[in-house]
Amino acid sequence: HAIDVSREAFWCDKVTGLSQHSWLRAIGWYTMALIDTLDQVDNKDHKYDAECKMLEDAFKDLVDSMLKYQDESGMWYQVVNYGGMDKNYLETSGSSIMAYALLKAVRLGYLSDDYAQYAKKAIDGICERYLKTKEDGSLSLGGICLVAGLGGNGRRSGTVSYTHLTL
């Protein structure tokens, strides 16, 4: 989800500069940005065909890659590439973002209708796991990441060590 082009940060791969941990919300924001951009580009005159094709291919590749990480509950883990690891958890906001991106792409015709089932499964998983009715009848939604980030001085490496901080 991050890169240090200097390759000096303690959390980055010293060859690529990339963070070794993939955060769901970062991936979700990127996925959402791709489909939202495709929706906004005015390409009626086909002036941007090459650019739109590049965005569409990136979107489809990302979605297909992320579906491999979708938990049987329908949700995705906060640190995607460490699903099921102790202290990692199924995260609500990123799973919601992925469901949004999938449904929007189906509606716009960038993905086949078959992809809607993955979004529905995510929404159902969120509701079953984290949507609760309080005593006063109001709803409460949990499992939302409270804090995540990379830091300096050997702290906040992006691992699951602090993913237990949720709403």
Walk through the language-model features, giving the residues of each:
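CBM-like carbohydrate-recognition segments
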Residues: 89-90, 94, 99-100, 105-165
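Residue-level preference for long, well-ordered alpha-helices that form the structural scaffold
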Residues: 19, 26, 48-55, 87, ...
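Long, well-ordered core segments of solenoidal/helical folds
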Residues: 1-11, 56-74, 118-136
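Flexible, glycine-rich surface segments
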Residues: 52, 58-80, 84-108
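Well-ordered alpha-helical scaffold segments within catalytic/enzyme domains
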Residues: 29-51, 96-111
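Acidic/His metal-coordination segments adjacent to aromatic residues that form catalytic metal sites
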Residues: 8-19, 77-87, 158-162
